[in-house]
């Protein structure tokens, strides 16, 4: 797939939502905690390890309000999550990239429609071991040189001659990961195109442990997992053409951390949207996400974008705002949502 024009481990959930926020809905919301104390049922969520902390945090707080609703949140990667979702094994799918054309074809074949809802922004973070004292930044071209298919880079000195003549140990998400898809699209110019000789895992904690335990390691994953483990890792600023920039809440939100800033999503199957527990859960998700997203280390959308996303759900607007085209680099979520509304 050609790149489009160029343009978060659950943290401790603060208990402030308890008596302060429940059960009264905030002004302008859709009434997620509006009263239905006898609401019951079950909701099954699976997919992205990146989105998992957000959905898990939302599920925990929702179940405090509605203890008779059982919400389970699993991890199988964005691609693995879509496989379950499109076979009707789950109600909601966590995704760290938009749905791919091949997945859209399966949805069409199985007669499945869905509503796509952005929930936060993330910045793919490039990490090294804290003992690494030679890397102060990497360029996009250097990342491509390291990660592209058929890469001949084996040692740090293959990237820059003055760097150590030591083997680079690479760590990254597996092929079912939306983070892997987005990174390869942004850096290598083709989704899924990468060298194969790296330690791959759908569990970001495995990647954290690997990089933290190896002086010569290099890897990437979502910003929240760096925030959760910043005492064990060293963040690498990336030069996308405007000088080295590190991911932060500000640079991710304003897009200056390019090309590795992205929106992340949940997908809801249309055929389950009428269930009362699903309706209330999604309304709660969209109205409370801003606070919970921050608590688990990601960057919230603006109030306007959460309102537009909730409107999308309430009106049952199906399909992807990315037209089923998968990862698209440099496309502004705000522009797409506003154009649709």
Say what each PLM segment does.
Residues 22-341:
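Flexible loop/hinge segments at secondary-structure junctions
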């Amino acid at each position: 797939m050609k790149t489009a024009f160029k343009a978060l481990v659950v943290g401790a959930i603060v208990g402030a939502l308890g008596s302060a926020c429940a059960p009264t809905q905030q002004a302008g919301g859709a009434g997620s905690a509006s009263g239905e104390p006898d609401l019951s049922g079950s909701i099954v969520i699976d997919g992205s390890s990146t989105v998992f902390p957000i959905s898990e945090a939302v599920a925990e707080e929702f179940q405090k309000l509605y203890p008779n609703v059982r919400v389970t949140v699993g991890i199988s990667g964005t691609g693995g999550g879509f496989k379950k979702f499109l076979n009707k094994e789950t109600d909601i799918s966590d995704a760290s990239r938009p749905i791919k054309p091949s997945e859209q074809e399966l949805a069409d074949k199985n007669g499945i429609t869905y509503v796509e809802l952005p929930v936060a922004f993330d910045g793919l973070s490039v990490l090294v071991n804290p003992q690494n004292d030679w890397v102060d930044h990497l360029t996009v071209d250097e990342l491509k040189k390291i990660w592209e298919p058929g890469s001949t880079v084996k040692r740090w000195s293959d990237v820059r001659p003055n760097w150590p003549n030591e083997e680079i140990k690479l760590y990254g998400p597996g092929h079912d990961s939306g983070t892997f898809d987005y990174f390869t699209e942004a850096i290598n110019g083709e989704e899924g195109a990468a060298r194969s000789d790296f330690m791959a895992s759908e569990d970001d904690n495995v990647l954290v442990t690997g990089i933290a335990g190896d002086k010569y390691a290099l890897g990437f994953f979502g910003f929240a997992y760096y925030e959760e483990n910043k005492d064990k890792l060293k963040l690498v600023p990336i030069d996308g053409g405007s000088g080295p920039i590190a991911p932060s809440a500000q640079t991710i939100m304003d897009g200056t951390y390019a090309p590795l800033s992205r929106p992340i999503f949940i997908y809801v199957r249309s055929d389950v949207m009428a269930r009362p527990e699903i309706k209330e859960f999604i309304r709660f998700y969209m109205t409370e996400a801003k606070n919970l997203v921050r608590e688990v280390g990601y960057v919230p959308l603006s109030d306007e974008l959460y309102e537009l996303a909730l409107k999308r759900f309430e009106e049952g607007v199906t399909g992807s705002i990315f037209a089923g085209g998968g990862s698209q680099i440099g496309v502004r979520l705000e522009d797409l949502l506003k154009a649709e509304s």
